[in-house]
From Swiss-Prot:
An individual GO BP term: positive regulation of JNK cascade
GO cellular component: cytoplasm
Limits of the Protein kinase domain: 24-277
Principal location listed in the UniProt entry: cytoplasm
PANTHER family associated with the record: SERINE/THREONINE-PROTEIN KINASE TAO1-LIKE PROTEIN, SERINE_THREONINE-PROTEIN KINASE TAO3
Name the record gives this protein: Serine/threonine-protein kinase TAO3
Source organism of this protein record: Gallus gallus (Chicken)
């Protein structure tokens, strides 16, 4: 994707497709920062006044800048609250994002710069209350601003407080990035990479620092190097309000915000219930403050405009002003401004605790507006009268007119054209009157100038922030990589466990199927054996019955023949009676044989049933033995599988333990490497800062040395003038004395007296000349000594300050190193405890599973034996009911059924 032409539809939807240069007109720069510039503009379609923040995403770190823009746009789109800046849209134009927001008059910081004194406590309370409401809204949606300061708290014409500049904001809470402005950073943000995450309470800390800023014009440690301030904040106690004249409620509020430990620090919602922001205050307190500030800004701009106008007139007519004229102009207007500022400004009695850099460098020599070059001979005339159009929030001048310089037509000399920079400045101050603001033109100019001058320091700080963020990204990337590796490892182990469980289940299913097949086979075999056994018995009984019938038949024949023989021998019995007796004897014999046959059949049936019953009992016992064998085989298989599973789990635990220790070592090694790199960078930055400060001091001393001859010449001229005055006095005295002596002495002695007086005059002048030379020499020596002493004192003070900052850096780095080592030790102990606890849980689980398996084994075997015992008992009871008696002792030949 080429930046500026996003191909991702989701990203493309964040930006409007229109050309911003056609929509927004009349752009005037009203602010400047590391991101770029903020402009006042008018929407040509709706005539709405807006603020345009231009952010370039070309050059170095293009992708990082682009991602920051996307993040800020997404963040702004989600905001909808009276105390957050209203988002209007974002446009892309030639690798520059035009972020359009509602226009505000300026920031709380601008008020401090305009009035050059702290705000009143009631004004601070009103601003803080509005900022807190915005923060509470952000924090309730798990968002963090991360760059709260007076410069990012804006005010609108009706006195509404707005949070702005969400370039450092975090959409998620907690976060762990090193972002923000050094002097306002909370300790946990500075230590974010070293100690972990932070939440919305970092904004509460920054708000407390902002309260001190509004009360003392500058945040704590502002006179310190920004890097050194970071080290100071990270390891020293929280700052407090310096003056005792503030109320206890305000002091308590600031102390409450600046609790060092985040857990003890209140949330933004808690602070909204604090007496400092809840107490009564005039409803128009901010509106009045804004109006006073606007009046003061207008007076400042008018003063600068009059200066530029006079320079224009002077350059047009006679060339540049002399230095003395400039000083007179400055002193005159300065005294007027001072008197007016005293009447307009805040009347708080607390003095400023630090010197504003703005008061030292309110230069107007680098204004960037362009004067219309088509009228080089025109001179602007300015009226002091102005009105504020409250409906359009635009301040308009009544009497801006142009007249032609008549002097230029009368004077035939070549005219001197005003310099372009002076024209630019004059038009800049004139054009500013077209919109309402509480930021003076000199402040805008100074911001631009400082942005250009402090590029090296800003690059160093941004490079340091970038390095910290890069380190954080490296740690997060490594953590994600290690987490992915651990997840992959655990997934692999889980698959192995699942594979083992599946294989075990399959093996048990196979075993169950095999046992079922064996049981079915045994059942079929038993049924076949039983059938064969029955057939054998029946065949034998059939054979026995045939033998028995044959025997009966033979016996019947024998008996019949025997009876016949007996009857034949008995001749006395009648034949009829013999026949009857033979028939009866046959019947008896047949009856006896029938009874014997029936008895044999009964014996055979009993034998058959009893032996079949006994065979069934043996078959059942054999089946029981097979069931016992099967359950023992199944339980043994389960135990073997469980033991294999336990061995695998122990192996997994050991491999996981080894991986965890290796990953912890890798993470800690990277963290220590990054800390060493960070400390090395911090040391290099500090050394570079020290060299820069020494160079600046050396340059200052060199300039003083170059300036020294001029100063000495002036002082020498002053001494010479004093000498000349003394000489004149002595000459007058000599003349008076000479006249007096000539009048009171005879004329004959005049020559001697004149010679004597001449010698005395020569002697005194010689002494005076000697004194003059001695004064010159003493003055030069004194000035040189004073200069050397002052420069040496400055060098000594600088060395002491730099040494203290270096010691502060060393202490900070030592603390960070000790904290990191302690953190690593805690992580190692935590890992050891986790590993030990996990191993104990695993061993307990193994023990419990083995006990459960043994219990299952005992219960299943017991249940099987009881079932089999009940089955045999039921079978034997049924056998008894069938009259078979005890079948256990039945052991006789199959043929012995009689």
């Amino acid at each position: 994707m080429r930046k500026g032409v996003p191909k991702d539809p989701e990203i493309a939807d964040l930006f409007y497709k229109d050309d911003p240069e056609e929509i927004f007109v009349g752009l005037h720069e009203i602010g400047h920062g590391s991101f770029g510039a903020v402009y006042f503009a008018t929407n040509s379609h709706t005539n709405e006044v807006v603020a345009v923040k231009k952010m370039s995403y070309s050059g170095k770190q293009t992708n990082e800048k682009w991602q920051d823009i996307i993040k800020e746009v997404k963040f702004l789109q989600q905001l909808k609250h009276p105390n957050t800046i209203e988002y209007k849209g974002c446009y892309l134009k030639e690798h520059t994002a035009w972020l359009v927001m509602e226009y505000c008059l300026g920031s709380a910081s601008d008020m401090l710069e305009v009035h050059k004194k702290p705000l009143q406590e009631v004004e601070i309370a009103a601003i803080t209350h509005g900022a807190l409401q915005g923060l509470a809204y952000l924090h309730s949606h798990c968002k963090i601003h991360r760059d709260i300061k007076a410069g990012n708290i804006l005010l609108t014409e009706p006195g509404q407080v707005k949070l702005a500049d969400f370039g450092s904001a975090s959409i998620v809470s907690p976060a762990n990035s090193f972002v923000g402005t050094p002097y306002w950073m909370a300790p946990e943000v500075i230590l974010a990479m070293d100690e972990g995450q932070y939440d919305g309470k970092v904004d509460v800390w920054s708000l407390g620092i902002t309260c001190i800023e509004l009360a003392e014009r500058k945040p704590p440690l502002f006179n310190m190097n920004a890097m050194s301030a970071l080290y100071h904040i990270a390891q020293n106690d929280s700052p407090t309000l310096q003056s005792n004249e503030w109320s206890d409620s305000f002091r308590g509020f600031v102390d409450y915000c600046l609790q060092k430990i985040p857990q003890e620090r209140p949330s933004s919602a808690d602070l909204l219930r604090h007496d400092f922001v809840r107490r009564d205050r005039p409803p128009r307190v901010l509106i009045d403050l804004i109006q006073r500030t606007k009046d003061a800004v207008r007076e400042l701009d008018n003063l600068q405009y009059r200066k530029m106008k006079k320079i224009l007139f002077q350059e047009t007519r006679n060339g540049p002003l002399t230095e003395s004229q400039e000083e007179e102009e400055d002193s005159e207007h300065g005294s007027n401004l001072s008197r007016k500022m005293d009447s307009l400004g805040s009347n708080h009695s607390i003095p400023s605790m630090s010197v504003s850099t703005g008061s030292q460098s309110s230069s107007v020599s680098s204004m960037q507006e362009v004067l219309d070059e088509s009228s080089p001979e025109l001179v602007m005339m300015h009226s002091d009268e102005s009105t504020v159009n409250s409906t359009s929030s635009v301040v308009q001048k009544k009497d801006h007119v142009f007249i032609r310089d008549e002097v230029g037509h009368r004077d035939r000399r070549p005219e001197v054209r005003p310099t372009q920079s002076v024209q630019n400045q004059a038009l800049h101050y004139r054009n500013r009157e077209r919109f309402a603001t509480i930021k003076s033109a000199s402040l805008v100019t100074r911001q631009i100038h400082e942005h250009e001058q402090e590029n090296e320091l800003r690059e160093q700080m941004s490079g340091y922030k970038r390095m910290r963020r890069q380190h954080q990204k490296q740690l997060i990337a490594l953590e994600n990589k290690l987490k992915a590796e651990m997840d992959e490892h655990r997934l692999k182990l889980q698959k192995e466990v699942e594979t083992h469980a599946n294989n075990s289940s399959i093996e048990l299913e196979k075993l169950a199927k095999k046992q079922v097949a064996v049981m079915e086979k045994e059942a079929k075999t038993a049924a076949a054996d039983e059938k064969k056994f029955q057939q054998q018995i029946l065949a034998q009984q059939k054979k026995d019955m045939a033998t028995f019938l044959e025997s009966q038949k033979k016996q019947y024949k024998l008996c019949k023949e025997k009876i016949k023989e007996e009857m034949n021998e008995d001749h006395s019995t009648p034949k009829k009676e013999k026949q009857e007796r033979i028939s009866k004897h046959k019947e008896n014999l047949q009856h006896t044989q029938a009874e014997e046959e029936a008895h044999l059949l009964s014996q055979q049936r009993l034998y058959y049933d009893k032996n079949c019953r006994f065979f069934k009992r043996k078959t059942m016992i054999k089946r029981h033995e097979l069931e016992q064998q099967n359950i023992r085989e199944e339980l043994n298989k389960k135990r073997t599988q469980k033991e294999m599973e336990h061995a695998m789990l122990i192996r997994h635990d050991e491999s996981t333990r080894e991986l965890e220790y290796r990953q912890l070592h890798t993470l800690q090694k990277l963290r220590m490497d990054l800390i060493r790199l960070q400390h090395q960078t911090e040391l290099e930055n500090q050394l570079e800062y020290n060299k820069r400060r020494e160079r600046e001091l050396h340059r200052k001393h060199f300039m003083e040395l170059r300036q020294q001859p001029k100063n000495l010449k002036a002082m020498e001229m002053q001494i010479k003038k004093q000498f000349q005055d003394t000489c004149k006095v002595q000459t007058k005295q000599y003349k008076a004395l000479k006249n007096h002596q000539l009048e009171v002495t005879p004329k004959s002695e005049h020559k001697t007296i004149l010679k004597s007086l001449k010698d005395e005059q020569t002697r005194k002048l010689a002494i005076l000349a000697e004194q003059y030379e001695q004064s010159i020499n003493e003055m030069m020596a004194s000035q040189a000594l004073r200069r050397d002493e002052a420069q040496e004192a400055e060098c000594q003070a600088l060395r002491l300050q730099l040494q203290q900052e270096m010691e502060l850096l060393n202490a900070y780095q030592s603390k960070i190193k000790m904290q990191t080592e302690a953190q690593h030790e805690r992580e190692l102990q935590k890992l050891e405890q986790r590993v030990s606890l996990r191993r104990a849980h695993l061993e307990q689980k193994i023990e419990e599973e083995l006990a459960a398996l043994q219990k299952e084994r005992s219960e299943r075997i017991k249940f099987l034996l009881e079932r089999q015992e009940r089955e045999i008992e039921t079978f034997d009871m049924e056998s008894l009911r069938m009259g078979f008696g005890n079948l256990v002792t039945l052991d006789y030949p199959k043929e012995d059924y009689r």
